[in-house]
Amino acid sequence: MSAITITDAAHDYLADLLSKQNTPGIGIRIFITQPGTQYAETCIAYCKPGEEKPEDKALGLKSFTAYIDAFSEGFLDDAVVDYATDRMGGQLTIKAPNAKVPMVNADSPVNERINYYLQTEINPGLASHGGQVSLIDVVEDGIAVLQFGGGCQGCGQADVTLKEGIERTLLERIPELKGVRDVTDHTQKENAYY
């Protein structure tokens, strides 16, 4: 069982594209650039025989082989490749909900664990207000230096959110963290939620 699903419509669309390449044995390679970061991009590329990497996982499909990049594989859990037709023709879509989620464990560096909780627990809640928070640094005394953006920048409730929501969550999950500090310029209020 693969972590990625390629729908029948996507399979047929890709098989048609591959058949036009006039390269026997051509397949596709699925990978993520900058996985586990906010800049993650999920990609599908043609993969001629011999272009696959030895560590790639080969996923044999009805008409071709999809090679899954080994480093990207965990980030492709629950990913779906689909093809939807519309009046203009159609569009291939790749939904990879875990592409931007860092993979961490208890032994991961503090900054990686902070980013993980910001991405998975904190920012989804802030997104409902058009906001987000980013880790700038972890200073020597165990303080996470954070910066708000979007609807949180200039928001009158940012301090409450910082202390009651973000700090409480991070301190519960990362015992060696001692606190958080906000370095956002809250005088910029044009996008503020409150």
Swiss-Prot record:
Query: What is its biological role?
Result: Involved in iron-sulfur cluster biogenesis. Binds a 4Fe-4S cluster, can transfer this cluster to apoproteins, and thereby intervenes in the maturation of Fe/S proteins. Could also act as a scaffold/chaperone for damaged Fe/S proteins.
Protein name as annotated? Fe/S biogenesis protein NfuA
Entry keywords, A to Z:
4Fe-4S, Iron, Iron-sulfur, Metal-binding
Instruction: Look up keyword Ribonucleoprotein and say if it applies.
Output: no
Write down the Gene3D superfamilies for this protein, in alphabetical order: Fe-S cluster assembly (FSCA), HesB-like domain
Please provide, alphabetically and separated by semicolons, the GO molecular function terms listed in this UniProt record.
4 iron, 4 sulfur cluster binding; iron ion binding
- Family affiliation: Belongs to the NfuA family.
In its UniProt record, which GO terms are filed under biological process? Answer: iron-sulfur cluster assembly; protein maturation
What InterPro entries does UniProt report for this protein, alphabetically?
Answer: Fe/S_biogenesis_protein_NfuA, FeS_biogenesis, FSCA_dom_sf, HesB-like_dom_sf, NIF_FeS_clus_asmbl_NifU_C
- Please name the gene that encodes this protein: nfuA
Could you give the subunit structure recorded for this chain?
Homodimer.
Query: What residues bind [4Fe-4S] cluster, as annotated?
Result: C152, C155
Source organism (scientific name): Pseudomonas fluorescens (strain ATCC BAA-477 / NRRL B-23932 / Pf-5)
Q: Which cofactor does it need?
A: [4Fe-4S] cluster
Q: How is the cofactor bound?
A: Binds 1 [4Fe-4S] cluster per subunit. The cluster is presumably bound at the interface of two monomers.
